[in-house]
Amino acid sequence: MAGRSGDSDEDLLKAVRLIKFLYQSNPPPNPEGTRQARRNRRRRWRERQRQIHSISERILSTYLGRSAEPVPLQLPPLERLTLDCNEDCGTSGTQGVGSPQILVESPTVLESGAKE
């Protein structure tokens, strides 16, 4: 784990082991029984998963001293984004991937659906 001190690595490993143990202690529900029983088991399992998720976030913030949430990415305004399909877009799944094309003027096509 580049750029970290050894003590921080140990804290991170301890936190990950604890979170892994929490998730392993809540296996998926048994698919047997009546529909209502299965539904109740799934509902209780999902609630436990939500609790484990919130506990995991608290563990990470305590051990690492920071939030588990990523830093928000700054995006340009939606009205300035457009798809540029001038170059042979349909031949490969990787073509057209990259930085978005930005228009100076907002296109009128996007504004036609908004009624005031």
Swiss-Prot record:
GO terms for cellular component: host cell cytoplasm; host cell nucleolus. Belongs to the HIV-1 REV protein family. InterPro entries: REV_protein (IPR000625). Changing residue 35 to A/K: Decreases methylation by host PRMT6. Changing residue 39 to A/K: Decreases methylation by host PRMT6. Residues 23-49 are annotated as: Disordered. The gene is rev. Changing residue 42 to A: Does not affect methylation by host PRMT6. The lineage of its organism: Viruses, Riboviria, Pararnavirae, Artverviricota, Revtraviricetes. Asymmetrically arginine dimethylated at one site by host PRMT6. Methylation impairs the RNA-binding activity and export of viral RNA from the nucleus to the cytoplasm. The methylation site is still unclear and either occurs at Arg-35, Arg-38 or Arg-39. It comes from Human immunodeficiency virus type 1 group M subtype B (isolate BH10). A motif (Nuclear localization signal and RNA-binding (RRE)) lies at residues 34-50. It is found in: Host nucleus, Host nucleolus; Host cytoplasm. Escorts unspliced or incompletely spliced viral pre-mRNAs (late transcripts) out of the nucleus of infected cells. These pre-mRNAs carry a recognition sequence called Rev responsive element (RRE) located in the env gene, that is not present in fully spliced viral mRNAs (early transcripts). This function is essential since most viral proteins are translated from unspliced or partially spliced pre-mRNAs which cannot exit the nucleus by the pathway used by fully processed cellular mRNAs. Rev itself is translated from a fully spliced mRNA that readily exits the nucleus. A motif (Nuclear export signal and binding to XPO1) lies at residues 73-84. One of its GO terms (molecular function) is DNA-binding transcription factor activity. Residues 36-47 have a biased composition (Basic residues). This is Protein Rev. Keywords: AIDS, Host cytoplasm, Host nucleus, Host-virus interaction, Methylation, mRNA transport, Phosphoprotein, RNA-binding, Transport. Homomultimer; when bound to the RRE. Multimeric assembly is essential for activity and may involve XPO1. Binds to human KPNB1, XPO1, TNPO1, RANBP5 and IPO7. Interacts with the viral Integrase. Interacts with human KHDRBS1. Interacts with human NAP1; this interaction decreases Rev multimerization and stimulates its activity. Interacts with human DEAD-box helicases DDX3 and DDX24; these interactions may serve for viral RNA export to the cytoplasm and packaging, respectively. The RNA-binding motif binds to the RRE, a 240 bp stem-and-loop structure present in incompletely spliced viral pre-mRNAs. This region also contains the NLS which mediates nuclear localization via KPNB1 binding and, when the N-terminal sequence is present, nucleolar targeting. These overlapping functions prevent Rev bound to RRE from undesirable return to the nucleus. When Rev binds the RRE, the NLS becomes masked while the NES remains accessible. The leucine-rich NES mediates binding to human XPO1. One of its GO terms (biological process) is viral process. The modification Phosphoserine is found at residues 5, 8, 92, 99. Residues 18-26 are annotated as: Homomultimerization.
